[in-house]
Amino acid sequence: MTRPAVIVDTNVIAAGLLTKQNASPVARILDGMLGAAFPFVLFEALLAEYRAVLVRPVLRKRHGLTVAQAEAILTDLAQHAIVLAPVGAQPAPDPGDQFLWELLATRADLVLITGDKLLLRDVGMQGRVISPSAFVSAAN
């Protein structure tokens, strides 16, 4: 059976870089994206948000990567991604995440992986918005 394509929220990418536990769900998701182990979706604004977060000085101090190293990771992610253009969608629970809702609306089979509790609790997207641990558990 083919796995559905996923959208990976920025908080999962950042947590994957920050964790010291290689077996943690966020680390496994980031490693899977870098290794093209499952299909995932990007678009320009999401990749830009990944970059903006990963190169923040406070985060760089914690993950220890240079800007060039962070950009190399982003390049790898972009090379393995399915690129889609977002479409209009219902309002997201958090207006700052509207672009994720619009990307989710592009295809009925997409699933969003996030650690954002507000997004995870959205009743209208139940089953389409899952936690990193739920994604990893379903993959096993």
Where in this protein do the model-derived segments appear?
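PIN-domain endoribonuclease scaffold, especially VapC-family toxins
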Residues: 31-88
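Acidic, PIN/NYN-like endoribonuclease modules and their adjacent C-terminal/linker elements
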Residues: 90, 94, 105-113, 117-140
